Amino acid sequence: MRMRYALLLILCSAPAAHANDFPTRARVEFVLDCMRSSKAPQQESMYKCSCAIDEIASKVKYATWVDLATVANAITIAGERGGVMRDMKDGRKIAASYRELQAAAKKHCFLNE
């Protein structure tokens, strides 16, 4: 009986571990950047932006998020430096998936409404 209970606890905690692989620093940076661009009052935007990063963290691992963000941001660099990412085979698809992930999180958390 105890073994079943322990196994049940382990299985139920697995999704939470995935959602919590984002470092605190990364979450805070996201929330601060999000709050800066939000037109909502400060406390409201803090809750909505916190919701957004939690939603993103529930969908992708932190390493994947870093890769998506890096490519999406590098594509916007003008000139040859950004050209490396723009010329990459899947660069634009990666950037699009990053934007879709952010848009879904914002919609889920009622950001910019």
Show the residue positions of the predicted features.
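N-terminal secretory signal peptides that target proteins for export/translocation
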Residues: M1-R2
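Charge-dense, low-complexity intrinsically disordered segments
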Residues: D21, Q43, M88, R92
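Sec/Tat signal peptide C-region and signal peptidase I cleavage site
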Residues: P15-A19
